[in-house]
């Protein structure tokens, strides 16, 4: 598993990459809601009862670490011997399915592809954790 440290310039590019992912994933979520009601929206009201810092830890810090370790670490590396695209698509598919509903699958699968490409480009799981944190943190803060 690539735990290569990141230069400050790479971190800045990763943050920009993540910010550019946000409109794409938002659009896919909206598109998916044409077919199926978003199941996650109903549970979001429960989150508003917590302090923002609690929500940030629960939604934007812990999941990126655990999910990136699992999907871009274990799954990606398991599929990598079959080729880059098998690793990217296989880990993205597992990442999408883990979200367990159609709406989240749609954007999580595409985000998983973007994160797999980011892992391949940077060679560091810290890059995918950072990008995942930015995306989750953005939606949690809003």
Regions found by a protein language model. Give the residues of each.
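Active-site His/Glu-centered metal-binding helix of metallohydrolases
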Residues: 65, 69-70, 74, 101, ...
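Membrane-interface helix/loop boundary segments of multi-pass membrane proteins
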Residues: 66-90, 117-124
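Juxtamembrane helix-loop-helix connectors linking adjacent transmembrane helices
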Residues: 1-69
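Aromatic-enriched alpha-helical transmembrane segments of multi-pass intramembrane proteins
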Residues: 48, 84-86, 142
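Functionally important transmembrane alpha-helices
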Residues: 92, 104-142
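Hydrophobic alpha-helical transmembrane segments
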Residues: 11-15, 53, 57, 85-90, ...
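Hydrophobic alpha-helical transmembrane segments of integral membrane proteins
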Residues: 12, 16-21, 93-108
């Amino acid at each position: 598993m690539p735990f290569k440290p990141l230069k400050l310039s790479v971190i800045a590019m990763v943050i920009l990459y993540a910010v550019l992912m946000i409109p794409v994933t938002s659009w896919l979520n909206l598109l998916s809601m044409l077919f199926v009601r978003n199941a996650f929206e109903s549970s979001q009201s429960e989150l508003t009862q917590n302090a923002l810092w609690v929500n940030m830890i629960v939604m934007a810090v812990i999941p990126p670490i655990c999910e990136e370790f699992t999907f871009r670490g274990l799954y990606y590396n398991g599929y990598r011997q079959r080729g880059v695209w098998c690793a990217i698509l296989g880990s993205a598919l597992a990442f999408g399915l883990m979200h367990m509903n159609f709406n989240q699958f749609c954007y999580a699968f595409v985000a998983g592809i973007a994160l797999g490409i980011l892992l391949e480009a940077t060679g560091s799981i810290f890059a995918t954790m950072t990008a995942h944190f930015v995306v989750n943190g953005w939606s949690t803060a809003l």
